[in-house]
Amino acid sequence: MKVLFLSFLLIIAAVSCSTVDEDCMCTEEYRFFLVTVVDTLGIPVDSLAITIKDKDGDELDVLQETHPFGAGKYTVLNDSFTQMFCACGTPEKIYFSATDGSRVANGEFMFNTDECKCHINKISGPDTLSLK
């Protein structure tokens, strides 16, 4: 009976083990990428209406928080969007638009993620946009 019980435990232990496809360990770092929007005089502008879209034109709900980094800073993308990217590292376009109702600032950005989908990476895109 004892041998049967131990055999049963060994079988359960072997079945419950799983193999991990990738060795992924994400850090607690939370990445977000900002853009500064300025007027024609180069003065940062707050309180703009922001629209962010993916490559298919679908609008992304990117939370815009007040940043301690100064006026006119807007979040383009953050780590909460890693799942929308391919783990293959292929960059995808993100379109950013800010308006005060009469003037518009537009920017195109390229982002990707790591193979574990832990963090986003900004591949290209402006740091500053001007309202025109």
What residues fall within each predicted segment?
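Extracellular secreted precursors and ectodomains with disulfide-bonded cysteine-rich loops/domains
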Residues: 15, 22-24, 84-86, 114-116
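Beta-strand-rich domain onsets/edges
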Residues: 17-32, 38-41, 120-132
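A short beta-turn/strand-edge loop motif at beta-sheet boundaries
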Residues: 41-47
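Sec-dependent bacterial lipoprotein signal peptides
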Residues: 1-18
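Hydrophobic alpha-helical segments, especially N-terminal targeting/anchoring helices
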Residues: 37-38, 53
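Tryptophan-paired
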Residues: 48-97
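Residue-level signal for glycine
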Residues: 42, 57-60, 103
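Structured interaction patches on ligand/partner-binding surfaces of diverse proteins
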Residues: 98-125
